[in-house]
Swiss-Prot record:
Acylglycerol lipase activity is activated upon binding to progesterone. One of its GO terms (molecular function) is nuclear steroid receptor activity. Residues 37-422 are extracellular. Progesterone-dependent acylglycerol lipase that catalyzes hydrolysis of endocannabinoid arachidonoylglycerol (AG) from cell membrane. Acts as a progesterone receptor: progesterone-binding activates the acylglycerol lipase activity, mediating degradation of 1-arachidonoylglycerol (1AG) and 2-arachidonoylglycerol (2AG) to glycerol and arachidonic acid (AA). Also displays an ester hydrolase activity against acetyl ester, butanoate ester and hexadecanoate ester. GO terms for cellular component: sperm flagellum; sperm plasma membrane. It comes from Danio rerio. Its EC number is 3.1.1.23, 3.1.1.6, 3.1.1.79. The chain crosses the membrane at residues 16-36. This is Monoacylglycerol lipase ABHD2. Pfam families: Abhydrolase_1 (PF00561). The active site is at S213, D348, H379. Keywords: Cell membrane, Glycoprotein, Hydrolase, Lipid degradation, Lipid metabolism, Membrane, Serine esterase, Signal-anchor, Transmembrane, Transmembrane helix.
Length: 422
């Protein structure tokens, strides 16, 4: 009997490792499947989807801006994941970011606030020979010292552009507020003050308006608020903005694309900025902020809660809906008449697909608007690279400067451009 059992053990034992190897192989296959799915490795690359009217100017701009119409190729292993593109942008901004040297300017505002911006002179002559200044509005809570801004400024300087970068009110950690007010979603006061300073100081310069994310909302709202704001403006470029805070409100509470998690993380960052200025914001004699409940700020888990308890009160809005309605560029952007490039990414986890009907419809109706939608890029990522390591310069940087160059050439040589088309 024991001999028979021993024989059975000898017969079964060689099969046991084979079974375990099969389980390991299945586990590895499952992990690889999850990686491939989460990194979207099977997703193709493509050129940006362009929406615009068939006009002479648009033909010229698309022909003169090949980076906009050629295939955008992100890093192979992770670049097709909007989450990783967004995370890398949020964590490091850009790789090997340069440190351009500029001068910090301080502008007193009528309400006692002090706007600041950094001014960077060009490092060469522009291809047109003209004096051209890029006026740049960064993303939420950002400023001129952020890596993605530094990279873009350095690249623009080398192309012959002067750059003026707004530091959002309260965003710089080493600059104290001088009034009980900080930046909001759509307040254009500081951006307007910076543009006004540039126009007065450099009376011959022409302007390129650039906005990133929240900065895109502010830039477009500023241009659309008053036709006079578009004087001496050659064009505007907006990247990764959401266009309507009211319509975005519901999407930010959804777990789709982990949007609720991003909402929590951004709210946590906003809390840190607000609390770093608690003495200036809540310690001064401010009738608008006396009803702000700091205990609700500490427990807030979404931007909407912070906006309702704190942000809307800076400008006396009676409700969150009123705040979002009046501070969104969707109600002003149709007033922009200068060439306007709107760039978004399909895999941006912060901007829901439903919001992209706004720029698409605008581009279909207005001759001066081009809407470019990429498959990949995340939120302000748009990294390029071969396999693993991204390049210092992003696709976004190249597109903005290339488009700006094309508009400048068009304005400089309009008769020749018309003849080339004919």
């Amino acid at each position: 009997m024991s001999a028979q059992l021993e024989a059975d053990v000898r017969t079964m034992s060689p099969e046991m490792p084979a079974m375990f190897d099969g389980m390991k192989l299945a586990a590895v296959a499952a992990v690889l499947y999850v990686i491939v799915r989460s990194l979207n490795l099977k997703c193709p690359t493509a050129a940006a989807d362009i929406t615009c009217q068939d006009t002479l100017l648009n033909h010229y701009l698309l022909k003169s801006c090949p980076v906009l119409t050629k295939e955008y190729i992100p890093p192979l292993l992770w670049g097709k994941s909007g989450h990783l593109q967004t995370a890398l942008y949020g964590k490091i901004g850009r790789v090997k970011s340069p440190k351009p040297c500029g001068l910090r300017k301080f502008l007193p505002m009528q309400d006692g606030a002090t706007a600041t911006f950094d001014l960077f002179e060009p490092q060469g002559v522009h291809s047109t020979g003209d004096d051209i200044t890029m006026v740049i509005c960064p993303g939420i809570g950002n400023h001129s010292e952020k890596h993605y801004i530094r990279t873009f400024v350095d690249y623009s300087q080398k192309q012959g552009y002067r750059c003026a970068v707004l530091n959002h009110l309260g965003a710089l950690p080493n600059i104290e507020l001088t009034s009980p007010r900080m930046f909001t979603y759509g307040c254009t006061w500081e951006f307007s003050a910076m543009v006004g300073f540039i126009k007065r100081t450099f009376p011959q310069t022409q302007l390129i308006v650039v906005g990133f994310s929240l900065g895109g909302n502010i830039a477009c709202k500023y241009l659309g608020e008053n036709p006079a704001n578009q004087e001496r403006v050659l064009c505007c470029v907006s990247v990764c903005q959401g266009y309507s805070a009211l319509r975005a409100q519901e999407t930010f509470l959804q777990w789709d694309q982990c949007r609720r998690l991003y909402n929590f993380l951004m709210a946590d960052n906003m809390k840190k900025i607000i609390l770093s200025h608690r003495g200036s914001l809540f310690g001064m004699n401010s009738s608008r902020m006396e009803f702000a409940d700091l205990s609700r700020l500490y427990t807030a888990t979404s931007l909407m809660q912070i906006d309702d308890n704190i942000m809307r009160k800076f400008h006396g809005h009676n409700s969150l809906k009123e705040y979002y309605e009046k501070e969104s560029c969707v109600h002003y952007i149709h007033n922009i008449s200068v060439p306007l490039l709107l760039v978004n990414s399909s895999d941006d986890p912060l901007v829901h697909q439903s919001l992209l009907t706004i720029p698409r419809t605008l581009a279909e109706k207005k001759q001066n608007v081009i809407f470019a939608l990429t498959l990949h890029g995340g939120h302000l990522g748009f990294f390029e690279g071969a396999v693993l390591f991204p390049q210092p310069l992003s696709w976004m940087d190249k597109v903005i400067v290339s488009y700006a160059n094309a508009v400048c050439q068009w304005e400089k040589h309009k008769p020749q451009c018309h003849q080339q088309k004919e």
